[in-house]
Amino acid sequence: MASLSRVLRVAATCPRGRAAWNLGLQPLATEARPTTEKSVPYQRTLKEEAQGASVVPQGPSQPLPSTANVVVIGGGSLGCQTLYHLAKLGVGGAVLLERERLTSGTTWHTAGLLWQLRPSDVEVELLAHTRQVVSRDLEEETGLHTGWIQNGGLFIASNQQRLNEYKRLMSLGKAYGIESHVLSPAETKSLYPLMNVDDLYGTLYVPQDGTMDPAGTCTTLTRAAVARGAQVIENCAVTGIRVRTDDFGVRRVAAVETEHGSIQTPCVVNCAGVWASKVGRMAGVKVPLVAMHHAYVVTERIEGIQNMPNVRDHDASVYLRLQGDALSVGGYEANPIFWEEVSDKFAFGLFDLDWDVFTQHIEGAINRVPVLEKTGIKSTVCGPESFTPDHKPLMGEAPELRGFFLGCGFNSAGMMLGGGCGQELAHWIVHGRPEKDMYSYDIRRFHHSLTDHTRWIRERSHESYAKNYSVVFPHDEPLAGRNMRRDPLHEELLGQGCVFQERQGWERPGWFNPQETAQVLDYDYYGAYGNQAHKDYTYSRLLGDEYTFDFPPHHHMIQKECLACRGAAAVFNMSYFGKFYLLGVDARKAADWLFSADVNRPPGSTVYTCMLNQRGGTESDLTVSRLAPGTQASPLVPAFEGDCYYLAVGGAVAQHNWSHINTVLQDQEFRCQLMDSSEDLGMLSIQGPASRDILQDVLDADLSNEAFPFSTHQLVRAAGHLVRAIRLSFVGELGWELHVPRASCLPVYRAVMAAGARHGLVNAGYRAIDSLSIEKGYRHWHADLRPDDSPLEAGLAFTCKLKTSVPFLGREALEKQRATGLRRRLICLTVEEEVPMFGLEAIWRNGQVVGHVRRADFGFTVNKTIAYGYIRDPSGGPVSLDFVKNGEYALERMGVTYAAQVHLKSPFDPDNKRVKGIY
């Protein structure tokens, strides 16, 4: 039997593109022969795609029902978990259709690893539920063992930044009661004697991590689901999705078609894995994912490896999974092989392993566990996996088709995320929204212009695959799929040193570096596939400089922008914002129902408000301006009958807002429409004590407090161009937003800059907004304000019209919450020591962990680190203001605690004078 070291020698001498097994290493090839590997649930012939399909039994495993409440397509991990959780929620008439047999496609050959700690609180919760389902719930319900093995997990750090990341994970784990330990190299050696620790800085050990058996888990899931009335039908390929259009012109799912008949249903769940895009096309739904080859090898027996924890050596981009008395070795490479033509006939097929691609993982594995150099290879597994543009799954209801849900694109994490995601998807289907904040997985996180853009999907999916094991730094940005959407000021700001961030395809200003130009170049695939890697790439170098959990090297440049805004004025290009018009005969009714605040004030008023879901969770925060009819239609005042409201929403979440509003309009059958003018209008925000003096030279309007109060808007002329000026602030200063027709953006910007030159006006970006807004206590949606947070918990009760009798979406939930008391509450904490924090730090109160930080940044005006997070009472009681005030607090950063002071109001300008122009 060939050893791993021989593979390295052969690969080193083998010409590029030539198969290593042509040199006589037949045992290393995935040839067509029977296999009975433990990880393979069925005795099949493993073949390349070109060698043909496995034999498929004729006819479905049981008769098709004529109707179903829900049809799940795909019998892999997500399909089985979703069916199980639908059944647990009491959904009758739930049917799972599998083209071949359960686990076919990807699930059957997955490694089945479960790691409990990830740099996301929501993912930690999802993983915890999966672990509970496979390690306890299923066995209690069915009496069957799922194949769960708890052997622990070990993360390897071979540099200080990686160890810092692990310390952050350890602190987050304390908020969830997850046991973990940061070990020294010597302690690691004691735990794992076969490991080379000479190059280690340390490790993170999580004793209760483990592995799952895909076949055992899926079999047990479906048995439990069937016991609750669900149906599982194998050998039944879906051939089409029938769609109907209702009386309001809304497309809805009507039926699922198969070769053996159709099933009428209002709801379809696409859990088809690498075939999900094809299923989406059947219904006219865009599914942005790509299929790639993903591989691991299984070694021969290794003496002394039994009971060792699974290992992730992130810096070597390799994992080592315990498999009895052997190891599975796999990882993520910079040059994965795309599966260009996804075959329908590949249910239990495997590809031949490309040793040129896989060799790098062997090198990393041998370095970490040297005994592998002399260990033989028992088998290779190279199968298809689906990957997405941001390495997050695709879930939720498709914006193109009501009743069509996604549960696909799991980036090799479908087993470990399956339980949590299956539960949330079931809630999504039954209740309209998930229980947790699933925005990072929601298909609506992508702008509709990107979800069928082939180049963008391919580039971003490649980069997310290649960086799967990279450290997750706070200020990282993608290099792939850039320059998709640029506003009219892009080139102007680039020439002034703007370092851009990417959000929903938009290039938005991050911060300014006047010393050099940082153009974002076309994606080079990190030099893979014959591409020439960029040299002297300024933008990439600036990003790399910020790869730290300390204060970044450009910290002082963000400081200059912030202090200029507080002391004089700054201009923020916010043109990437979503800008919608809600108009029509029922627009007022829709506004009453959609918005938590009373927006039905006289035309000329602007209101900060939230949009809620049925459970009272916050789906959005935004500003709504009521408009008066114009004399003629324009980008600033569309023609309308009835009422019209102008909505300005964060650009990073604009598609989510658009979809949420349209869903509510459809459900309530309001006779109004939502018009998207995001590309037609730019947006400049001029903020600071000098903003009035600057703009008074540019605008033809009286900007005094009496003539132009806070939270009002007017149509004015700026340097001769008609604009909408709104007196608002995202940073806690006197200031105005200018909403400008696209063609006028550049001349208006130049006029503002010219007028501001003598007042000290500077360009500033979103890094400055992050710091300035946290000082003032303004919320950021999807950070300290999410769909699982109510406005009452978040300190935003003032945005809710609870003192009126006007019904609005989520009102009943808020009234119930107010009556029973808040079980958690958002608090503000500051740390006297100058220490960087970015979120996920544990919050200690009186010696107990009571929560974790959602959002943190450094406040340059107060010269302190500021953190916001939700806390609970460990006894389970309501969290009152007295509970908040009467505690001693500390924040744990990377295992070190820092004393913290709690604030009931924002630490900067708590009396709210500056936005009123009182300095």
UniProtKB/Swiss-Prot annotation:
Q: In which pathway does it act?
A: Amine and polyamine degradation; sarcosine degradation; formaldehyde and glycine from sarcosine: step 1/1
Segments spanning the bilayer are none
Entry's InterPro entries? FAD-dep_OxRdtase, FAD/NAD-bd_sf, FAO_M, GCST_C, GCV_T_N, GcvT/YgfZ/DmdA, GcvT/YgfZ_C, TrmE/GcvT_dom1
Recite the UniProt cofactor note for this protein. Binds 1 FAD covalently per monomer.
Which GO terms fall under molecular function for this chain's record?
A: sarcosine dehydrogenase activity
Query: Which residues does this entry mark as bearing Tele-8alpha-FAD histidine?
Result: 109
Name listed for the protein in its UniProt record: Sarcosine dehydrogenase, mitochondrial
Q: What is the lineage of its organism?
A: Eukaryota, Metazoa, Chordata, Craniata, Vertebrata
Does the keyword Mitochondrion feature in the UniProt annotation? yes
Q: Which family does it belong to?
A: Belongs to the GcvT family.
Q: Tell me which residues bear Phosphotyrosine.
A: 778
**Residues with PTM N6-acetyllysine:** 174, 560, 776, 803, 885, 905
Reaction equation(s) it catalyzes: (6S)-5,6,7,8-tetrahydrofolyl-(gamma-L-Glu)(n) + sarcosine + oxidized [electron-transfer flavoprotein] + H(+) = (6R)-5,10-methylenetetrahydrofolyl-(gamma-L-Glu)(n) + reduced [electron-transfer flavoprotein] + glycine
Q: Transit peptide range? A: 1-22
Subcellular localization(s) per the UniProt record: Mitochondrion matrix
Q: Which UniProt keywords apply?
A: Acetylation, FAD, Flavoprotein, Mitochondrion, Oxidoreductase, Phosphoprotein, Transit peptide
Superkingdom of this protein's organism: Eukaryota
Known function: Catalyzes the last step of the oxidative degradation of choline to glycine. Converts sarcosine into glycine.
The gene coding this protein: Sardh
Q: Name one GO cellular component term.
A: mitochondrial matrix
EC code(s) of this entry:
1.5.8.3
Record's signal peptide: none
